[in-house]
């Protein structure tokens, strides 16, 4: 089986996907209302799409192609407003967050769609435990070789993206000690982790054909890599972010990734080397476990810094690129948010410390998603 052609795509355009929680407004547990919500959304003409996800207590929204941060924010707000209106008609709530803090995974139902049913047969209980919620960001690439170079360049910022977006400290009613517990569920899948270190599309085709011949995978969808090429869109897809609590944060994360991509493309700050991946798993664990307080090991120098400090330093490096991309608002939002509260995991823990009730935490998450909370 061949990968086929890598589609033409305008460089540095964006696409944003968000997986959302559907909760009831009685006790704020997950609600199996995806079918009804999708039916109501058919009456709304919005950019992008809203589609089912693995279980019937979640949905995925996607923007259309976005030129910049403001475009992404505008599209996300328009889709958000339509979804909130439809949810109100069903007396359910919608919220961000990488995990629902107290849902019982065994009560989940797989959405009635052939691919989801097939995955359920293959992965068993892991499929129901995959009721987790992430943000994916697509970045347009002018060609396949450039896409792979960008993929490997962005890989050193995977811990930064995890720490900034982390919003999943609670699982099954328990504080896990992780800022992003969601990714622990992803790591359970056999094709998760990082992409192989190949830098040309021809070499990637060779790898892909070897994998399909083994019967381990059938298509690119079977790879759950942190970043993967998306040839049919002409993009790379960054997949490690927890779903933020607001569309503003989601758009800002997309803007940050766009700025990093331009910085890597224009300044070429380092040469790619497979040894750069030596601290990759350690850095990723530090980001998941400790968030912004995690330690980042620079793959070139071996220097140890906190992710908080390295992220703030990256904002300074990206200043001119943010101006060129009209993404200053994204960087300013993330800097202010980092200095004020940290990340969404910190906010969730703070509200739980105040309220001592996870249902109230979810209620306030719904308010924030609707643009009404603190």
Curated annotation (Swiss-Prot):
What's a single GO BP term from this record?
A: modified amino acid biosynthetic process
One family from Pfam that matches here is GCS2
For this chain, the family text in UniProt reads: Belongs to the glutamate--cysteine ligase type 2 family. YbdK subfamily.
Q: What is this protein called?
A: Putative glutamate--cysteine ligase 2
The family database entries (InterPro entries) matched by this protein are listed as:
GCL_type2/YbdK_subfam, GCS2, Gln_synth/guanido_kin_cat_dom, YbdK
Per UniProt, which keywords does this protein have?
ATP-binding, Ligase, Nucleotide-binding
What Enzyme Commission number does this protein have? 6.3.2.2
Catalytic function, reaction form: L-cysteine + L-glutamate + ATP = gamma-L-glutamyl-L-cysteine + ADP + phosphate + H(+)
Cited function: ATP-dependent carboxylate-amine ligase which exhibits weak glutamate--cysteine ligase activity.
As one GO molecular function, the record gives: ATP binding
């Amino acid at each position: 089986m061949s990968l086929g052609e890598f589609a033409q795509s305008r460089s540095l355009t964006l696409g944003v996907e968000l997986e959302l929680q559907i909760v009831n407004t009685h006790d704020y547990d997950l609600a199996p209302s995806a079918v009804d919500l999708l039916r109501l959304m058919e009456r709304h003409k919005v950019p992008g799409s809203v589609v089912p996800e693995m279980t019937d207590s979640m949905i995925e929204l996607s923007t259309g192609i976005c030129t910049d941060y403001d475009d992404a924010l505008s599209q996300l707000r328009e889709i958000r407003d339509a979804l909130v209106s439809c949810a109100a008609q069903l007396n359910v709530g919608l919220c961000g967050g990488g995990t629902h803090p107290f849902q019982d995974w065994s009560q989940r139902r797989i959405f009635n769609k052939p691919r989801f049913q097939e995955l359920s047969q293959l992965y068993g209980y892991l499929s129901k435990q995959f009721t987790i919620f992430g943000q994916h960001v697509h970045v347009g690439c002018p060609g396949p070789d450039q896409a792979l170079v960008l993929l490997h360049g962005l890989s050193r910022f995977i811990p930064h993206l995890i720490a900034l977006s982390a919003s999943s400290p609670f699982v099954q009613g328990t504080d896990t000690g992780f800022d992003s517990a969601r990714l622990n569920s992803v790591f359970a899948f056999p094709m998760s982790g990082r992409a192989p270190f190949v830098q040309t599309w021809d070499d990637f085709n060779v790898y892909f054909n070897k994998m399909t011949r083994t019967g381990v995978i059938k298509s690119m969808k079977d790879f759950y890599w942190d970043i993967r090429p998306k040839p049919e869109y002409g993009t790379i897809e960054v997949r490690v972010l927890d779903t933020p609590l607001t569309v503003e944060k989601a758009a800002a994360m997309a803007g940050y990734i766009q700025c990093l991509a331009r910085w890597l493309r224009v300044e070429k700050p380092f040469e790619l080397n497979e040894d750069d991946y030596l601290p990759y798993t350690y850095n990723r664990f530090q980001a998941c476990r400790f968030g912004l307080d995690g330690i980042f090991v620079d793959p070139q120098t071996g220097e140890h810094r906190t992710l908080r400090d390295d992220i703030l330093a990256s904002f300074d490096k990206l200043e001119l690129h943010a101006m060129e991309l009209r993404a200053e608002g994204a960087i300013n939002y993330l800097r202010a948010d980092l200095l004020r509260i940290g990340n969404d995991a910190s906010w969730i823990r703070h509200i739980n410390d105040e309220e001592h009730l996870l249902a109230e935490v979810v209620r306030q998450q719904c308010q924030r998603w609707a643009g009404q909370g603190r």
